[in-house]
Design a protein with these regions (language model features):
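Non-catalytic terminal extensions that flank enzyme cores
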Residues: 1-47
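His/Glu-based metal-binding/catalytic segments typifying zinc-dependent metallopeptidases
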Residues: 40-42, 49, 162, 166, ...
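M16 family metallopeptidases and their MPP-like homologs
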Residues: 45-55, 81-129, 136-147, 174-199, ...
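Hydrophobic, small-residue-rich alpha-helical packing segments that form membrane-like cores
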Residues: 150-219, 225-243, 247-274, 280-282
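Active-site His/Glu-centered metal-binding helix of metallohydrolases
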Residues: 62, 66-70, 578
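Generic recognition of flexible, low-complexity loop/linker segments
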Residues: 94, 210-214, 273-276, 319, ...
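Non-catalytic, conformational "gating/processing" segments within enzyme and secreted inhibitor domains
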Residues: 158, 210-242, 720-755, 942
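Extended, regular secondary-structure scaffolds
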Residues: 211, 223, 232-251, 374, ...
Length: 973
């Protein structure tokens, strides 16, 4: 069958998308009005999504709650959580759903055609025929509900989205971005919080929620996307027959309206909560925000991305530097948001004070006027363009399929113009245009028009308030107490019964016959062989080099790995400071701003990272490297190598002013990452109680070090510069160096030539070195911050108790994450997420994410061994868990990821036979293998290593669980 044979569809456009080496097709389903965009090519990582325009009219989070709930069972697949069943039992390379300010999308991806069809089928049924109309419990569980355990207990509110958004509203960055949207678009859907404001989520009724689904989840309001190597005609014929052909187009107005421009800029002040020990001084956020036309201007869409780099984001960018030099804020960021109908551009100063507002605005205006008059730095513009174009051509989105990112980008134009889904994907002509404009005043005129003369602008101030969370919680408790007091005895009994009923509903598993309706692959569909390693050893001037011979599309990925095991334990946090300094201070030939421009003009970037490689046999053995990475086109590698030498051997570490700026900015960034990634912070900290390797990844010690350095900089600066210089000369030596290269064979000679010039410049190793003495100490800490939720972590090491690693642990991870922990911590407990991990060196952790509970979650962890002991699974269930595990193991890799995986195996001394053995253990696993892990996990939990990050009041109330409870910012005081 061919596309032209499909009578149900009208082909609106079919043409090559040369920039992506693909064919683009735009179609409309005649009967239902559904829109379809196809990007057809030879990529076997196929992507599908169905999306809807979902403009909210309030901040109850209705669009977000629907996104969660349509994946809780449907007509054809009536299980309670088909999403989880698919995660456990499919070979998906991506599976999720996302709510944006005015759209909701349901994407899936898979390299297996049968699996891809299964996933499409479940998702199409979920959005069009969800069980939400049959079971109000789904709305209560995922959205919100009142809870009352007994007549004497207080009424509380729980729900997954409710708790997720309590976590989101704990972050000042999130609060600021929401206030910017509200300030600039007060009369449009963007003024509302599509994710839901916890204050307003409980205002949403079940009927209003169903009405929203009825209104917007119709094919005529849908956007269907297909990408990759597939029989497009077959997929479209199936969609027509199974779903779209059953609907008639209706008159539905979901158009996103433009905000009428302002007559003058407006100002908004809003509060956010800080903990009782944080200072209100230097904790305000100031932002200046403007609206930039519409997302349908492809030149402006990219030009402001470049201006973001040239003005604010690049090291030493003029607007950033002017504000820092004026003493306004410790971190200056730019925010160009092109994912809405009217893109916005923001300049944000973090960690400043409200009285600096006029000064902040004056510095912005003076700096921008100076740039318009005297011209922008041409190299800075070129660097921004080249960096953006390199990323576009490389299309490396980490573990996200590139087809998914292309599909999401389609909606930046498609949502507002049915005929232009590919507008922003065809970017090479725009890059050429922008390069030509560098020598003109094009960019300066954009500054004049959109940043200086633009009345459609706002100033948003986010001020800290101590104990605001506690005040809001007290107000909520009072409101709930009044609500309870207004209930009759019968109503109280009903609420207790409803609470009990919901728990019973959550505890009742889906019937086996329903579970069997979820389509699933067989064990025979799985690839038996593990992915190969690509390691060839050679030597250049006595330095070991490992070459990963992989097709890399003309790019060389080069990593210099310097051993740092000799760095004393007390100096480990300073490795993070060194990493932040290199490339961000002046060098012999460049200011740090010029250095950044040179890097971005000639390469895909130069970065540093700390790589930790635990032994797979010995829990106390590990390798740790200071890694300096670059990527460049073959003909640009000489420039990349020259810039690496410049950075490593001529950086000016004596510049105290610059050093202070870097430390203050780094501390500010770390604050944000602690609030957004508290699960990672807590689990790593818990592992430092017993694991030497974990000490190198401990965010909290690093954060405390930065707080101390910032607060006492004048006393510490001499010792700090001396320490950093000593580190440079002791780390960057020939004896410490190991080189990793990912490219085809024909690129290797280019690398060897550059290494021959690089190696003689390395420092000499002075004297004998011994490995750092790291002595883990069990502390069991609670770290209080201004969050409304918690991140609860338990950890231990099974090798310490004589147990060996087994492939079945990979399956246990899936079982825990999507059965035991999911049901108890997320479904019943209301947390947004839960994770667990089992390393080959024995390090093990369990952690919750945006969790309202502490003691209850800890008790759930204690129940894991009993769950494993009683674990039963028939052949179908075991196969499902195994498929989900293999899906995790077989995530498609780009060239750099293949190289990194091969290098990690080399450093950890993992043979191909060992990973094949692990894969065989996974594919051949039985329920007995899972039950056999009971004693291992019991031994880990018996260590009782507990670390919790989060809500101040909850941690204080549970102080007895910890050795110490303290504020995250304690070292600042």
């Amino acid at each position: 069958m061919q596309l032209k044979d499909l009578q149900a569809y009208e082909i609106l456009e079919k043409r090559p998308i040369k920039d992506l080496n693909s064919e683009g097709i735009i179609l409309r389903h005649k009967k239902s009005g559904a829109r379809i965009a196809v990007i057809s090519n030879d990529d076997d990582n196929k992507v599908f999504y169905i999306g809807f325009r979902t403009p909210p009219e309030d901040s109850t989070g209705v669009a977000h709650i629907i996104e969660h709930t349509v994946l809780c069972g449907s007509d054809k697949y009536p299980v309670k959580d088909p999403f989880v069943e698919l995660v456990k039992g499919s070979l998906n390379t991506f599976l999720n759903a996302m709510t944006y300010p005015e759209k909701t999308i349901y994407p899936i991806a898979s390299c297996n055609d049968k699996d891809f069809q299964n996933l499409m089928s479940v998702y199409m049924d979920a959005v069009f025929h969800p069980n939400i109309y049959k079971y109000q419990e789904i709305f209560q569980q995922e959205g919100w509900h009142y809870e009352l355990e007994s007549e004497d207990a207080p009424v509380t509110i729980n729900g997954v989205v409710y708790n997720e958004m309590k976590g989101a509203f704990s972050s000042p960055d999130d609060v600021l971005s929401r206030q910017i949207m509200t300030s600039l678009f007060p009369d449009t859907t963007y003024a509302n919080v599509s994710g839901g404001d916890p204050l307003h989520i409980p205002e949403l009724t079940y009927e209003e929620y169903l009405d929203f689904h009825r209104r917007y989840y119709h094919p005529c309001n849908s956007y269907i996307y297909l990408y990759g190597d597939m029989d497009v005609a077959e997929k479209l014929a199936w969609m027509d027959e199974a779903y779209l052909g059953k609907y008639e187009a209706i008159g539905l107005d979901s158009e996103i309206k433009l905000q009428k421009p302002f007559e003058k800029p407006i100002e908004v002040t809003h509060k956010y909560s800080i903990s009782s020990t944080e200072s209100e001084e230097n904790n305000t956020y100031l932002s200046y925000n403007t609206v930039i036309e519409t997302a349908l201007d492809e030149k402006l869409y990219l030009a402001f991305d470049i201006l973001d780099y040239a003005l604010v984001s690049a090291p030493g960018a003029p607007l950033k530097q002017a504000l820092i030099d004026a003493g306004i804020g410790s971190e200056i960021t730019g925010g160009y948001d092109s994912g809405t109908l009217q893109p916005t551009f923001s300049v944000i100063a973090k960690n400043t004070n409200p009285q600096e507002k006029e000064h902040f605005l004056a510095v912005i205006r003076e700096t921008l006027e100076g740039l318009v008059k005297n011209g922008l730095n041409k190299k800075s513009l070129l660097a921004g363009i080249n960096s953006s174009e390199f990323r576009y051509r490389e299309a490396d989105f980490g573990h996200f399929p590139k087809g998914l990112l292309y599909g999401i980008q389609c909606l930046d134009s498609w949502l507002y113009d049915d005929m232009r889904p590919f507008l922003h994907l065809e970017a090479l002509d725009t890059y050429r245009f922008l390069k030509e404009q560098v020598e003109t005043d094009y960019f300066e005129q954009l500054i004049q028009k959109y940043l200086l003369n633009n009345k459609h602008a706002s100033v948003v101030i986010i001020e800290p308030e101590k104990g605001l969370n506690a005040k809001n919680e007290a107000a909520l408790e009072k409101k709930l107490a009044e609500y309870k007091a207004g209930l009759s005895e019968d109503e109280i009994r009903k609420l207790i019964a409803d609470t009990k009923h919901l728990k019973e509903y959550q505890e009742t598993p889906s019937p086996k016959e329903d579970l069997e309706k979820i389509p699933m692959l067989a064990r025979s569909d799985m690839k038996k062989e593990a992915a190969p390693f690509y390691n060839t050893e050679l030597s250049v001037k006595g330095v070991p080099v490992v070459h990963h011979d992989i097709y890399s599309n003309g790019i060389i990925y080069l990593t210099m790995l310097f051993d740092i095991a000799h760095v004393p334990a007390e100096d480990i946090p300073y490795l993070g400071v060194l990493k932040a300094v290199l490339g961000y201070v002046d060098t012999k030939n460049y200011s740090y701003a010029d250095f950044a421009n040179e890097v971005n003009i000639h390469t895909g970037g130069i970065s540093s990272t700390i790589g930790v490689y635990p032994s797979v046999k010995d829990k106390d053995d590990y390798q740790v490297k200071f890694e300096v990475r670059t990527k460049a086109l073959y003909d640009k590698l000489p420039e990349a190598a020259t810039l690496m030498k410049e950075m490593l051997f001529t950086s000016n570490i004596d510049d105290e002013k610059r050093l202070y700026e870097i430390i203050a900015e780094l501390k500010s960034r770390l604050q944000v990452s602690i609030s957004s990634a508290g699960h990672s912070v807590a689990s790593t900290r818990a592992m430092t109680y017993f694991s030497k390797a974990a000490a190198y990844k401990d965010t909290i010690t690093f954060y405390e070090t930065l707080c101390d350095l910032e607060a006492h900089f004048d006393e510490r600066k001499e010792a700090l510069t001396a320490k950093l210089k000593e580190m440079v000369s002791s780390i960057f030596t020939k004896e410490h160096l190991l080189v990793s290269v990912t490219c085809e064979k024909d690129g290797l000679s280019i690398v060897e030539t550059e290494l021959e010039k690089f190696i003689p410049m390395l420092y000499e190793t002075s004297g004998e070195e011994k490995q750092a003495e790291i002595v883990p100490v069990r502390k069991n800490e609670g770290f209080m911050d201004a969050s409304q939720v918690l991140y609860v972590a338990r950890a231990g090491n099974f090798r310490a108790h004589g147990f060996d690693y087994h492939g079945a642990l990979r399956i246990l991870k899936v079982i825990m994450e999507y059965d035991y922990l999911w049901i108890n911590i997320r479904v019943k407990g209301g947390a947004y997420g839960c994770m667990n991990g089992y390393m080959k060196n024995g390090d093990t952790y369990f952690v919750s994410y945006r969790d309202p509970n502490l003691e209850k979650t800890n008790e759930i962890y204690d129940g894991i061994p009993a769950y494993i002991e009683q674990f039963t699974a028939d052949e179908r269930d075991m196969t499902k868990y195994i498929i989900g595990t293999i899906s995790d193991m077989d995530v498609p890799m780009n060239p750099s990821t293949k190289g990194d995986r091969s290098m990690a195996a080399y450093l950890q001394n993992i043979s191909y036979e060992e990973i094949q053995k692990e894969r065989d253990q996974v594919i051949g696993a039985t329920q007995e293998d899972i039950r056999g892990l009971r004693d291992m996990i019991a031994s880990v939990l018996a260590e009782n290593n507990l670390c919790v990050v989060g809500n101040e009041e909850t941690l204080q109330a549970s102080e007895g669980m910890f050795g110490e409870v303290k504020h995250l910012n304690e070292s600042e005081r």
